[in-house]
Design a protein with these regions (language model features):
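Rhodanese-like catalytic fold shared by cysteine-dependent sulfurtransferases
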Residues: 1-24, 30, 39-71, 77-111
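Structural scaffold elements adjacent to functional motifs in cytosolic proteins
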Residues: 32-34
Length: 111
């Protein structure tokens, strides 16, 4: 007996490379979210990104203020913290796109 229709994805968000992420954020309706610390954000970030530190105690409260009807494109330094943030937001019903290589990969790619 087959169990077709039960092929859930292992994650509720998409993880993409730099080129795909650049295409996603070219849409001005997409919210760009940097989940690094304020200090890291101040040292450089993707243009137009807002900063909500995923490790802060108020991440869930602040992230809940994001518009629920818009895609959230998020990143951290290298792709670890962003997975945590993406899972939290996806569980809250947001459509989330995560940059696999983080800001380091973004800058290495010359973006």
């Amino acid at each position: 007996m087959g169990l077709f229709g039960c092929t859930a994805q292992s994650s509720k968000f998409a993880t993409v490379d730099v080129e795909e992420f650049a295409k996603v954020i070219a849409d001005t309706a997409v919210v760009r979210l940097d989940v690094r610390t304020p200090q890291e954000y101040a040292e450089g970030h993707i243009e137009g990104a807002i900063n909500i530190d995923v490790l802060s105690d108020d991440f869930v409260t602040e992230a809940s203020k994001l518009p629920a009807d818009r895609t959230i494109a998020l990143y951290c330094r290298s792709g670890n913290r962003s997975k945590k943030a993406a899972a939290i937001l996806a569980d809250k019903g947001y459509k989330v796109i995560e940059l696999a290589t983080g800001y380091k990969g973004w800058t290495r790619a010359g973006k």
